[in-house]
Structures are given as structure tokens and as C-alpha cells.
Amino acid sequence: MKVSIFGAGRVGISIAYSLLHTKIADEMVIVDIDIKRAEGEVLDLYHSTPFLKRCNITAGNPHDILNSDFVIITAGASQSAGESRLSLTKRNVKIIRQIAAQIKKYSPDAIVINVSNPVDVLSYVLWKETKFNWRKVIGTGTILDTARFRALVAKQCGVSPMSVHAYIIGEHGDSELLVWSNATIGGVSIKRFCQFCTNKNCTPLESLFEQTKNAAYEIIEKKGATNLAIGTATAALVESIYRDEKRVWTVSVFQDNLYIGFPAILGKNGVEKLVPVKLNSVEKEAFERSKEVIKKYIKEGEKSEREESSSN
């Protein structure tokens, strides 16, 4: 199985490293405009293969992604401290368009996973430019936001994160929302569970959600980038699709003519179906507002591209 990754930065290499530990890839190609860095990262990664399954890892050019089973995109300008993900739009849309053309040319049958931010906007651009079936173009969406919230709740409540079931949907960013009406711990409403919690130092659930929303900003401020958790999450996505596990993930998927974070069942061909999550009236309104935020930035990205084209 062949995986190609655009971007040899911290996120791209964290994904590659996590993928090595899944032991599913026979071949891996790392593509970056800084070929020297890509070669150095590949050499470092290759030295770990004696401890894992053998994998042919190379630093390459776009044509080296030929006939990939998966193409993962992490390339683009990175998010600065305090910067909104959506403010990255104009800088990254052009890069994604160039990559889309290369994927379409060399790996037209690949499943494409976009990690670059703003992930919802860029996943839409990627789908539109490749003209692939939307089921095979997936953004990481709110997969990490959902995981962060589950981890925070699990730590506070003294349970396994795997026993916390809650979805964060919408934009991977400031307008995302938590589906409180469906959030449970061990099948019990999360708010009901907390009524019987013996932890006397509990942080209010709403505050945990705010911590989740601000987690990336905090990590960027302290260490410069988020890379380890998203590396693990992306590798888990690839593995679950490759193994046809039919797992539910909150990923950025196509609906209502945009890409947005929503629970979906993923199988060997990509998105199999969206989970019919029932939202209450407040959640529906918040979800619609999040859609409008994404639509706004899609329009801005398209506008900037038209202006650039007309000036050339």
C-alpha cells in the first residue's frame, strides 16, 4: 500500500511516523519544496524501520506520487500564534490548487486526506479542483477537537476516553459546536453523569469545551505548532479506511455544497454515509452559523483567486 504526503514539516512527518507504527504502508513518498529537508526527514524515518515493518520511504517530486492509494496534504503556510485558521485562506488556496492538479494527474484513484488549514475551506477547494467523487476527498475536520474534548472529560471524570462519546461538529475553528444533546459517558447523558460525580474540583463542562476550542492556540503559543495528536489522528484515519473498519469519525465531508465537520462512517472507498445525528434547535442554529462562516471564506478564497488571475 502506497501513501504519499505533501509537506515535510512537523505535521507531515508526525503523520509519516505514526503511519510507520500502523505497519500498513509498504511505500511512502514525502514531497516538499525543500527537498533537502525532506531527504533528511526520510533518512531519520528510515532508521526506525528495523524496529517496525519494512517500508520503502523516499523523498520525491510530485510525479513520484504516481498510483498512490492515499495522498495526504499538510503543505501550506502554518498558523501563527493568535491567528485564526480561516485567516490562512488566501495564502493556502493557491497552494492547494497546485497540489490538486498534481494529484489528479498522477493518482486519480487515490483517497485524498487534507490536513492543511483552514481544513474545511481547503478540502472544498481540493474537491472542486480534482473533480473527484466527494467520498474520496476527506478533511480531518473536527476529529482532533472531538478527541481533545473526550480526553479532557475522561481525565476529569476518571473514565477511559473510549467511554466518552461526544461530537464536535462544524468548522474546525472558532464557530465549531459541541452536540451536547448526544454527549454520553458509558451510554449515560454526560450532564446526568456529572450529577453523580465525586470529583469536588470539577471544571464546568462548558469550560472544558472552551478549553478544547482554544487548545490549538495554547499549544502553538507554548511549542510553536500542533503536530503529534493530528499525526496520530490522521494515521488512524488512513488505517481505518484501509482496513475497512467502518468506524465513525468527525471529519470534514461534503454537504450543502461545502465541506464541514460531521460524523461519518468511513470504509475502504472513503465516506460511506453520514451519521444521522439529531440536533436540537439550538444546535441546528449553531451548525447553520458555522456553515455560513465557511461559505464566507470559500467566497473570499475564490474572489482572491479571480483577482490574482485578472491581474496576470
UniProtKB/Swiss-Prot annotation:
CDD domains: LDH_2 (cd05292). The active site is at H172 (proton acceptor). Allosterically activated by fructose 1,6-bisphosphate (FBP). Keywords: Allosteric enzyme, Cytoplasm, NAD, Oxidoreductase, Phosphoprotein. The modification Phosphotyrosine is found at Y217. Its EC number is 1.1.1.27. InterPro entries: L-lactate/malate_DH, L-lactate_DH, L-lactate_DH_AS, Lactate/malate_DH_C, Lactate/malate_DH_N, Lactate_DH/Glyco_Ohase_4_C, NAD(P)-bd_dom_sf. Its main location: cytoplasm. It is found in: Cytoplasm. Gene3D superfamilies: Lactate dehydrogenase/glycoside hydrolase, family 4, C-terminal, NAD(P)-binding Rossmann-like Domain. GO terms for biological process: glycolytic process; lactate metabolic process. It is an enzyme of class 1 (oxidoreductase). It catalyses: (S)-lactate + NAD(+) = pyruvate + NADH + H(+). Substrate binds at Q79, R85, N117, P118, V119, D120, D145, T146, A147, R148, T226. Catalyzes the conversion of lactate to pyruvate. NCBIfam families: L-LDH-NAD. Homotetramer. HAMAP family: Lactate_dehydrog. This is L-lactate dehydrogenase. It comes from Pseudothermotoga lettingae (strain ATCC BAA-301 / DSM 14385 / NBRC 107922 / TMO). The gene is ldh.
